[in-house]
């Protein structure tokens, strides 16, 4: 039945690694935790069970833009779905809630904050919720890269329901410590845990310490002219500067960051998505839910603040399984930029001073490991796998540390 649902609604003939185990667990009412790298198809793991189980599935996600994309895709596949978040007007919210109460939807996406509103809580009491899926589940852990205190209250919401639904938790990047936190803090019951593995053999990893970062970037992009790729920058200002330089140099590039209007972001995203503009220059605001398989390179113009962030962003390359390059342009000044950003992150009003201090301490620890990746000798792939708790018995023989730039895919 799972295969039939997958084929009927999503047009796939077979499950990807790890998906079927997750689907079988959830449809047999066993909680599940899926740790699957970006592009492994996490959404199928809860969308297929949602269609097989009676009642309605609630999907908790902090990513408002991703919700809209997922719901649009589900609707086009003939699945009645909706989202409830702050992008709706009060009237739209009222109508969506009314339809939800009438049983019009099979899958409802909600922001975690929505669980705390009296109107949603009242609705949930009378709805037959059969599945509750938690996306970006690492947000529940102080040891995760993006701790959100509101996630700590998900378990209480579940406990308040008349009947406990089966729970699925999903994340792209979680160390062993974060996995244990997810199970404990979401109160998962004897979960089936699936880790599909972090190794992506088709990705070539390289760290370059250029004398001139702009010149190094231009050199790579000229070599890869016509190919689709993403250039990540640490700040909006850097995105603007880099994108302008590329355009002046005759490279067809567009930009994406949170400072642009919704309209401009959407337009630029579509240019990149549909191959009318091959190079996207962006902050980390770009990429969540972007389903583009032919990205041939991801270049980090500056060092990210953590291995979690780096691997999630680099992992947007080569999702079609073909060879792709992940190149980081490292400069010692990146450390000061990253430290400044950690120290000047807006304090989260839902956190105590002690929690904020603990999170900052963890952020600094993660930054130090990121610097190790850029500066210490040794296989880059092995470093990544060990960081995420996987066994890396030997060097890969296929990264800049193992064999220098000579084994990059020079297309």
PLM regions: where:
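Helicase motor core with emphasis on the C-terminal RecA-like subdomain
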Residues: 3-9, 13-17, 21-43, 50-53, ...
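C-terminal accessory/connector segments of nucleic-acid motor ATPases
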Residues: 346-411
């Amino acid at each position: 039945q799972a295969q039939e649902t997958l084929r009927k609604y999503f047009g796939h003939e077979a499950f990807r690694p790890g998906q079927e185990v997750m689907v079988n667990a959830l449809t047999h009412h066993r909680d599940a935790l899926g740790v699957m790298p970006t592009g492994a198809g996490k959404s199928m793991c809860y969308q297929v069970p949602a269609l097989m189980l009676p009642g309605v599935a609630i999907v908790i996600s902090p990513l408002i833009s991703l919700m809209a994309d997922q719901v649009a895709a589900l609707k086009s596949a003939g699945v009645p779905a909706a989202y409830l978040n702050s992008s709706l007007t009060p009237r739209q919210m009222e109508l969506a809630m009314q339809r939800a109460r009438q049983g019009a939807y099979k899958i409802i996406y909600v922001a975690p904050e929505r669980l705390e509103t009296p109107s949603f809580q009242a609705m949930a009491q009378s709805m037959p919720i059969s599945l509750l899926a938690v996306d970006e589940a690492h947000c529940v852990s102080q040891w995760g890269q993006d701790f959100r205190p509101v996630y700590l209250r998900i378990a209480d919401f579940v406990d308040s329901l008349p009947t406990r639904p089966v729970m699925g938790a999903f994340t792209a990047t979680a160390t062993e410590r974060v996995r244990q936190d997810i199970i404990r803090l979401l109160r998962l019951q004897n979960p089936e845990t699936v880790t599909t593995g972090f190794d992506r053999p088709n990705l070539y990893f390289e760290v370059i310490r250029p004398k001139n970062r702009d010149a190094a970037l231009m050199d790579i992009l000229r070599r890869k002219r016509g190919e689709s790729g993403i250039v990540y920058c640490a700040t909006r200002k850097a995105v603007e500067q880099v994108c302008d330089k590329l355009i002046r140099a005759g490279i067809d590039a567009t930009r994406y960051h949170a400072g642009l209007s919704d309209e401009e972001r959407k337009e630029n995203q579509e240019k990149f998505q549909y191959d009318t503009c091959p190079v996207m220059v962006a902050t980390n605001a770009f990429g969540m839910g972007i389903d583009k398989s032919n990205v041939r390179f991801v270049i980090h113009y500056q060092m990210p603040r953590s291995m979690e962030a780096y691997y999630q962003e680099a992992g947007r390359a080569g999702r079609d399984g073909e060879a792709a390059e992940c190149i980081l342009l490292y400069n010692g000044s990146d450390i000061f930029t990253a430290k400044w950003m950690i120290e000047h992150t807006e304090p989260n009003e839902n956190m105590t001073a002690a929690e904020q201090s603990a999170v900052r301490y963890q952020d600094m620890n993660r930054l130090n490991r990121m610097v190790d990746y850029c500066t210490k000798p040794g296989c880059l792939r092995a470093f990544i796998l060990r960081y995420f708790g996987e066994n890396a018995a030997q060097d890969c023989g296929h990264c800049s540390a193992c064999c220098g730039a000579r084994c990059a895919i020079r297309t």
